[in-house]
Swiss-Prot record:
Keywords (A to Z) from UniProt: Capsid protein, Clathrin-mediated endocytosis of virus by host, T=3 icosahedral capsid protein, Viral penetration into host cytoplasm, Virion, Virus endocytosis by host, Virus entry into host cell
Annotated stretches, region: Core attachment: 393-422
Family: Belongs to the astroviridae capsid polyprotein family.
Protein name: Capsid polyprotein VP90
Region of interest (Acidic), residue spans: 646-783
GO biological process, one term: clathrin-dependent endocytosis of virus by host cell
InterPro entries assigned: Astro_capsid_N (IPR004337), Astro_capsid_p (IPR022027), Viral_coat (IPR029053)
Biased composition (Polar residues): 1-16
Record site feature (Cleavage), residues: R312, A313, R392, A393, R422, S423, M645, A646, D653, Q654
Chain residue ranges for the region called P2 globular domain: 423-645
Gene Ontology CC entries for this record: host extracellular space; T=3 icosahedral viral capsid
One Pfam family this sequence matches: Astro_capsid_p
């Protein structure tokens, strides 16, 4: 019996356009307009079973794909593929009842990061910085519910695909016209996308370098919106927690090796409760203003390079670094924007570039761009009108900004150009600060004096700056600071340093502010009388107010022999002063000490006195006459207290020991809450762990035990400072044990604390040096 004829499969590939009428025939001769591939898909003979049929189909697929690759219609072959699951953050609750954007995820591999403020990277970002092209084989957007299905109600979540990664004015119905998935709160969901949904303009490939054309680099984006106010099912109030955890599970393919290592350092972070305003006039660019002290501005300034050349008349130069800004708060609808770009801000995300120039009124300005391509081309949004007169004086709206660094003008290694960037001040560094003065609090309309604290202040209203509730200075003067420029000793720009862990600002026993820098000036009025002024640069952690008697300095004498002597006005004013959260203040404490001038940092809880003369020293000049608003003050300060001892007496004749006393335990923010858990001593914590150390313990074992205990305490949720103190007490070093022993013996023998501690430290250093020499010698002998 004759077999049936074989089935023929024909694939036609168009790899060129038809010849132009104006082109000579010779130029197009020999070029095929299409390629035909004929494949015999069935073997002759017996009828195929299921297995043979599958093999035949696979054979056809392989042959067709091979021929298509030969013709160059599928783009280059992937050099490497990487499967990864990226955790991008959470979907928040809806607080307005209207459509709110919760996330906008750009799929370029170097931009796929979580909003933690870290520049750390994974395998996808590392490969993106090494190859010039990328594409996606598939993409699954996983939404993992963070609440039960019965815990909240009233909200639906919509995940949609934006194929152009460009902001648009879309309603809930418009989002439904896209490829999308609706998700019910309390249930897990997966939004699946195929290669046909994710293909790029270059035979399915996208470019990796975000400095290139936006339409070739960004790829599609995933947007997540919510509709309907989220309410708690168990309480008659709104639910403000997270609804879903967002993850991307995908396989990225890369080709075309071209290393751009700096692309892995793109930053993504979030700034909560930041004040944002928009302004502009007809024919002028739309400008966004943000406080210079905000985390957003500090991050942008640190990562932006501003040109020093002058722009043309009427223009302002901008940085080359572009930032995507996503407003995830309900206040997006409350932001007042000049026309016609109200839709852009209400849509929830846009692009900005930093404008060159100094800080004005404590804010930095940004040009706003409606698309990434416009930002690269430096074409800002142009307003057709200004704000209505009734809205120009509207106060800034506090909102939440999630910002992403889109590009990096320099793609090489950045370590060799550190002098052009900003370093981070470390503990013990000396730095220089230029403070821009904010609105002063003054006793009269002429602003000729500045408020300072007066004597007889109620105890509960005293503001203390110190290491604890026993060793502190009393705040006398206070000046509001609108912005700060940080520099090192060579006037190179610095990042904002971390707060000084050993210092805190207290009202009563509760911590109210962090101290970032400090300085102390000592001047002799006579051989036996000295004036000590301390200045502290602080940032308020929570709002608080102080109500007490205030006065101000005046010059009692005007003759040439006593022009530096100042006194406090005996008249006082019972006034309330408010200290605002996140604002910067320069706090001043001035004390008079009788006796020999002490060394080290001096702590005296002494207030200003009416009957004493004060000199205008380095830390008090701004308190004598009020500096104008936006004027600048210059100080050289420290980010860590000097490690020295000093002993002196306050006005109550009580001994006060300076910082770094051996028996002095510092307490951190966790121990200064309203509950104040200082009753539990570190020795109690050590006993709770049942740790006993003999003097013959091996140093290596002690070090291992110390590391193990420290890790255990931190993993249990204890603060690093407290865990370190407990670990040091449980497993002290040989030098620490000797220093403690010698110090206690000398105190018992009648030696003073200062001399005893100095002698104990010297003995500990000698033992440490001898131990190092012995260890080195034994290693050399063994070798």
């Amino acid at each position: 019996m004759a077999s049936k004829p074989s089935k023929q499969v024909t694939v036609e590939v168009n790899n060129g356009r038809s010849r132009s009428r104006s082109r000579p025939r010779s130029q197009s001769r020999g070029r095929d307009k299409s390629v035909k591939i004929t494949v015999n898909s069935r073997n002759k003979g017996r009828r195929q079973n299921g297995r043979n049929k599958h093999q035949s189909n696979q054979r056809v697929r392989n042959i067709v794909n091979k021929q298509l690759r030969k013709q160059g219609v599928t783009g280059p072959k992937p050099a490497i593929c990487q499967r990864a699951t990226a955790t991008l953050g959470t979907v928040g609750s809806n607080t307005s009842g209207t459509t709110e954007i919760e996330a906008c995820i750009l799929l370029n591999p170097v931009l796929v990061k979580d909003a933690t403020g870290s520049t750390q990277f994974g395998p996808v970002q590392a490969l993106g910085a090494q190859y010039s092209m990328w594409k996606l084989k598939y993409l699954n957007v996983k939404l993992t519910s963070m609440v039960g299905s019965s815990a909240v109600n009233g909200t639906v979540v919509r995940v949609s695909l934006n194929p152009t990664s460009t902001p648009s004015s879309t309603s809930w119905s418009g989002l439904g016209a896209r490829k999308h998935l609706d998700v019910t709160v309390g249930k897990n969901a997966v939004f699946k996308l195929k290669p046909a949904d994710l293909g790029g303009p270059r035979d399915g490939w996208w470019l990796t370098n975000t400095n290139d054309n936006a339409s070739d680099t960004l790829g599609p984006s995933i947007e997540i919106h919510t509709l309907g106010r989220t309410m708690s099912s168990y309480q008659n109030q709104q639910f403000t927690g997270g609804l879903f955890l967002v993850e991307l599970a995908s396989e990225w393919c890369f080709t075309g090796y071209a290393a751009n290592p700096n692309l892995v350092n793109l930053m993504k972070s979030t700034d909560k409760q930041v004040n944002v305003t928009f302004n502009g006039s007809a024919g002028e660019p739309l400008v966004m203003s943000v406080p210079a002290t905000s985390h957003f501005v500090r991050a942008v300034v640190a990562r932006s390079t501003l040109p020093t050349s002058l722009a043309r008349a009427g223009e302002r130069t901008t940085s080359d670094t572009v930032w995507q800004v996503l407003n995830t708060a309900v206040s997006a609808a409350e932001l007042v924007t000049p026309p016609p770009f109200n839709w852009l801000v209400k849509g929830g995300w846009w692009f900005v570039k930093l404008i060159a120039g100094r800080t004005r009124n404590g804010t930095r300005s940004f040009y706003v761009y409606p698309s990434y391509q416009d930002a690269l081309s430096n074409k800002p949004a142009i307003c057709t009108g200004g704000l209505p007169s009734g809205l120009r004086a509207a106060s800034a709206v506090a909102t939440t900004l999630q910002f992403t660094q889109m590009n990096q003008p320099s793609l090489g290694h950045g370590e060799n150009t550190a002098t052009l960037g900003r370093s981070i001040a470390t503990a013990g560094d000396r730095l220089k600060v230029i403070l821009t003065v904010g609105q002063p609090v003054t006793p009269n309309e002429n602003n000729k004096q500045t408020w300072v604290g007066k004597t007889n202040t109620p105890t509960e209203e005293v503001v203390k700056i110190g290491v604890n509730t026993q060793n502190y200075n009393v705040m006398n003067g206070f000046t509001m600071i609108s912005s700060i420029d940080w520099y090192d000793e060579e006037m190179q720009p610095l990042e904002v340093p971390v707060p000084m862990s050993e210092l805190l600002v207290m009202k009563g026993i509760n911590k109210k502010a962090d101290v970032y820098a400090a300085q102390q000036y000592k001047n002799s009025i006579s051989n036996n009388k000295h004036q000590i002024t301390s200045v502290y640069l602080v940032r308020v952690k929570e709002n608080f107010q102080v109500t007490n008697h205030l006065s101000y300095f005046f010059r009692e004498k005007v003759d040439t022999t006593a022009t530096e002597l100042m006194k406090i006005r005996p008249q006082t004013y019972y006034t309330t002063v408010n200290f605002v959260q996140n604002n910067w203040y320069l706090l001043t404490s001035t004390v008079l000490h009788t006796g020999s001038l002490p060394s080290g940092w001096v702590w005296m809880n002494q207030e200003l006195m009416n009957n004493e003369n004060y000199i205008v020293d380095q830390g008090m000049k701004h308190l004598m006459t009020t500096p104008p608003v936006s004027s600048q003050l210059y100080f050289e300060m420290l980010t860590s207290l000097p490690q020295a001892m000093a002993e002196h007496f306050d006005q109550g004749d009580q001994a006060v020991v300076a910082h770094d006393s051996p028996g002095q335990a510092l307490f951190s923010a966790e121990e200064t809450d309203s509950d104040f858990e200082s009753t539990e001593d570190e020795t109690d914590e050590v006993d709770r762990f049942d740790l006993h150390l003999s003097s013959e313990s091996d140093d290596d074992d002690v070090e291992n035990n110390r590391v193990t205990l420290l890790s255990t305490l931190i993993n249990q949720g204890m603060s690093v400072e407290r865990a370190t103190r407990i670990t040091s007490n449980a497993f002290p070093t040989r030098a620490a044990r000797l220093r403690r022993s010698v110090y206690n013996d000398l105190l018992v023998s009648g030696l003073g604390p200062d001399a005893a501690w100095s002698h104990a430290c010297e003995q500990a250093r000698k033992v440490g040096d001898n131990h190092d020499l012995q260890a080195s010698g034994s290693r050399g002998h063994a070798e």
